Amino acid sequence: MIKLLKFYQDRGIKIIKGEGQYVWDEKNNKYLDMHAGHGVAFLGHRNKVIIDHLKKQMEEISTLSLAFDTPIREEMIKELDELKPEDLDNLFLLNSGSEAVELALKIARKITKRRKIVAFKNSFHGRSMGALSVTWNKKYREPFEPLIGPVEFLEYNNVDSLKSITEDTAAVIVEPVQGEGGVIPAKKEFVKSLREVTEKVNALLIIDEVQTGFGRTGKIWAYQHFDIKPDILTAGKAIGGGFPVSAVFLPNWISEKIEEGDHGSTYGGNPLAAAAVTAACKVAKSEKIAEQAQKKGELFMRILKEKLEDFKIVREIRGLGLMIGIDLKVNPSIAIKVLQDEKVLSLKAGLTTIRFLPPYLITQSDMEWASDATRKGISETESKRVAS
């Protein structure tokens, strides 16, 4: 019998359905889902608005090349216009975050006629060849070298390191909050300096918002926390409300230099994807999801800090909006397993961080549940550390 390749460690439970911020396993156990498909389900599982738009579109046409116009794309553009990144009036739709990063890197090389890309230590931008080339973790990169280069990795949140960005740099790619790297928010001084340096040497600034974008951090786009504007922005995950969609946003001065055949995607911008983005935009506006993420994120961080303040192995609780990391002084795997046993799903970030990526629908009661489970997980981690 054919078998699925396993690139992920099996979590040992079979999920059969989801709704809102919860999922259920085959034994009908209910879980608070703060894994959320690596953050995809920010608008909640089985969001009714998303489902209704997808059902309607499936009854009309589900696949169509971007060579042909169709009404749902026109509606999507109208709904997205209010939420688009400032001055980035052009977009191309793809299917995954890695694909969006690939296109952003291609555009940077074409526009600048330069080759070098600058990225940052602890970054994660994807696992396809180009995206992997600007991803820091050597475990991901080394088996597939040589990759695309030259790429130079600088210290994140270190203004002095930006001196390495010179006139041979095509682009700098950066996450406003490093997700896989440990849920590390960028410092405002760092981001503003980065924008100044890239402008000085005419290098493009690519902001990777595949995980941070579409409201999760308390703004529709996380770069808006830093009073700067990017040259290119990549988006994904939440923008499709659970449907696989990603996007690259560009300003007019770049789009004018893009030519037929520079890129393409068989499924990119298909009618179902356009319907999903249309619906997601409606939810984002009607539910004020960014404002909810900001308020709920602040409350969740406060509850976590109160519940975990007496643990010596907790190094830091950090994050932005509903992108939260609990950084330990030890491996968090035991705590993540205990959380799952307590019916709270989370994921690891970096070497020592528990990552929470809940849907915006999370309630204070959910936060208390998660915080109590986290306390139990860290307590067990601490006990086993002492015993060993």
From Swiss-Prot:
Coiled-coil positions: none
Modified residues (N6-(pyridoxal phosphate)lysine): 237
EC number, as in UniProt: 2.6.1.118, 2.6.1.124
Cofactor note: Binds 1 pyridoxal phosphate per subunit.
The protein's name in its UniProt record: [LysW]-aminoadipate semialdehyde/glutamate semialdehyde transaminase
Keywords, ordered alphabetically: Amino-acid biosynthesis, Aminotransferase, Arginine biosynthesis, Cytoplasm, Lysine biosynthesis, Pyridoxal phosphate, Transferase
Gene responsible for this protein: lysJ
Cofactor: pyridoxal 5'-phosphate
